Amino acid sequence: MGCDGGTIPKRHELVKGPKKVEKVDKDAELVAQWNYCTLSQEILRRPIVACELGRLYNKDAVIEFLLDKSAEKALGKAASHIKSIKNVTELKLSDNPAWEGDKGNTKGDKHDDLQRARFICPVVGLEMNGRHRFCFLRCCGCVFSERALKEIKAEVCHTCGAAFQEDDVIMLNGTKEDVDVLKTRMEERRLRAKLEKKTKKPKAAESVSKPDVSEEAPGPSKVKTGKPEEASLDSREKKTNLAPKSTAMNESSSGKAGKPPCGATKRSIADSEESEAYKSLFTTHSSAKRSKEESAHWVTHTSYCF
């Protein structure tokens, strides 16, 4: 309490000053960034994905976040920019052979080495514990250290050989300046994709609205519906049918009665080589002929029926 004798109070005990900003433990922050999911705060487990800003997530947590359509869903800063599963890239990580995991400290009587990491750079061998800068390629998902990217300059991936550009390199858990640069790139990339999608839609609509020119153009039909032999037979039959008509017209115009052409003579179906079932369809067949006694008295017939 003070001021009751025997105590000498100090100034900071009596006068309230500005509160000191609590410093975050750097080691604890690095462990949280590189070992835990940014969205669900659970330990990272395969499959591990990364967004366009370089943050690490569990793929299951991202899928659950996208499927959750409830109004109570908290849209935090960690996942507000993720609109679909295409906005994240599945990472291809290289395991650290020296990593023991939780097996080395099952009893809890050993010190946890925070410098030890689960994954390493496949090119240089640096551990991915936050002490070294790591990046991944958006085109293939391979992860390696920034030192490997600077020391071995190439236009293809160091692990899988896929070609990449400068915009495909995304820094994992970068600084504030790195996040700002990645955010501008992300916005430009999405705007470019929207413009390309809009330009593709009118082209598709024009192709549907405009029919083919070959369909509207007048001309002889090029469609063949049968064999060439059948087409030649049809043309011959048409010629034979047109020939008697032309001769009949010439005779009527000249006023001379001539003999009917040989093709115009009547031919009985009984003389043909067709089957009896086919011949029975005509009135000239024997089954169609009836005597006067068998035929009804009220039915009238013309001369050509029998």
UniProtKB/Swiss-Prot annotation:
Belongs to the rtf2 family. Interacts with DDI2; probably also interacts with DDI1. Replication termination factor which is a component of the elongating replisome. Required for ATR pathway signaling upon DNA damage and has a positive activity during DNA replication. Might function to facilitate fork pausing at replication fork barriers like the rDNA. May be globally required to stimulate ATR signaling after the fork stalls or encounters a lesion. Interacts with nascent DNA. Undergoes proteasomal degradation, via DDI1 and DDI2. Removal from stalled replisomes and degradation are required for genome stability. It is found in: Chromosome. The gene is RTF2. Keywords: Chromosome, Phosphoprotein. It comes from Homo sapiens. It comes from the Eukaryota. Residues 243-255 have a biased composition (Polar residues). This is Replication termination factor 2. The modification Phosphoserine is found at S287. GO terms for biological process: cellular response to hydroxyurea; mitotic DNA replication termination; regulation of DNA stability. GO terms for cellular component: nucleus; replication fork.
